[in-house]
């Protein structure tokens, strides 16, 4: 199938075409660039929500219940779920099938797991492009779910319009999230497993941390703290409504355009960096016996060597 045909099929709502395009993105297939170029004008209208937080807090269960509510409104949903990568295959270990299984047969839901491929951020390198492909395919909502790697979670902010930080009572997650800098990017706090005896205490702890931040208090949007149960769906309707309120706030304040401009800038920098790193690696592989030998023999320092490589890139 040609790239043009693949693009046309995706834009017409072909699920198999979407799956193939995302595979090309994830494998960094050279053809992916031309495809994204054709799809990009068809993006930018979907609601995008990022879910982040430590492993085991129930992000997937919350997302699954949220999807149910969107589907009741006949909205199409795309989910990009980033899993830890196998060190051998660089593929997603956990996979789609373990989570969100109830939505697999729903034609209005497209779930894709992507391996982190050693990426330092919480999101895989191609996850934002996968989200763009889903938008072009026609989803109304794109959900990004991170794997919970600590400080790198801040990358989710550049991919989503609204960031939901999911925490669990009785684990000290909020303190760890604060240390990692994740608290600063959250637009909504979600205390999941709210039937836990320490749920109210966890919410109070988050509130105390937020009250300390003077910068947050001065912002027009102060992050609300919601209580949910991913297993029963309790509190998910309120979460959905709060996400929509935040989207309305972003649009009315002009912040949505600012966020998206920043996100586009970061995406350009990210992929320029990936390409530059690849070209430099190829150059080193070609000239290892020459350039690197001089470095090994202390005839050339690493900084000067890198400058020589840059001259050729």
Name what the model sees in each region:
Residues 227, 238-313:
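Long, well-ordered amphipathic alpha-helical subdomains in the mid-to-C-terminal portions
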Residues 2-49, 57, 66-152, 159-166, ...:
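Nucleotide-state-sensitive switch-loop elements of NTP-binding domains
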Residues 152, 178, 235:
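Short acidic active-site motifs
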Residues 188, 194-249:
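Canonical P-loop GTPase G-domain recognition
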Residues 54:
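P-loop (Walker A) phosphate-binding loop of NTP-binding proteins
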Residues 62:
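Hydrophobic positions on the alpha1 helix immediately C-terminal to the Walker A/P-loop
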Residues 113-114, 165-168, 190-193, 227-228:
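Conserved beta-strand segments of the P-loop GTPase G domain that flank and frequently precede/overlap
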């Amino acid at each position: 199938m040609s790239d043009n045909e693949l693009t046309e099929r995706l834009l017409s709502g072909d699920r198999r075409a979407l799956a193939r395009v995302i595979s090309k993105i994830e494998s960094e297939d050279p053809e992916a660039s031309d495809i994204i170029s054709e799809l990009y004008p068809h993006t930018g209208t979907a609601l995008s929500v990022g879910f982040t937080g430590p492993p085991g807090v129930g992000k997937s269960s919350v997302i699954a219940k949220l999807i149910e509510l969107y589907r009741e409104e006949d909205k199409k949903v795309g989910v990009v779920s980033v899993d830890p990568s196998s060190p051998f295959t660089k593929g997603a270990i956990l996979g789609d099938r373990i989570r969100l299984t109830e939505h697999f047969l729903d034609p209005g839901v497209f779930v894709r797991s992507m391996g982190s491929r050693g990426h330092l951020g919480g999101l895989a390198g191609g996850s934002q492009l996968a989200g763009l492909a889903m938008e072009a395919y026609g989803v109304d909502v794109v959900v990004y779910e991170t794997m919970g790697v600590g400080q790198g979670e801040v990358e989710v902010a550049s991919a989503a319009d609204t960031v939901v930080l999911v925490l669990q009572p009785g684990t000290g997650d909020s303190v760890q999230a604060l240390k990692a800098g994740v608290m600063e990017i959250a637009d909504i706090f979600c205390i999941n497993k709210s039937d836990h005896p320490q749920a109210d205490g966890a919410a109070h702890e988050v509130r105390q941390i937020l009250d300390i931040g003077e910068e947050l208090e001065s912002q027009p949007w102060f992050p609300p703290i919601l209580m949910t149960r991913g297993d029963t769906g309790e509190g998910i309707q309120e979460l959905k409504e709060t996400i929509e309120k935040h989207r309305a706030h972003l649009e009315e304040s002009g912040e949505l355009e600012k966020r998206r401009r920043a996100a586009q800038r970061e995406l350009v920098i990210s992929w320029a960096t990936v390409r530059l790193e690849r070209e430099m690696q190829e150059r080193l592989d070609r000239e290892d016996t020459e350039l690197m030998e001089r470095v090994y023999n202390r005839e050339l320092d690493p900084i000067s060597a890198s400058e020589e490589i840059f001259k050729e890139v």
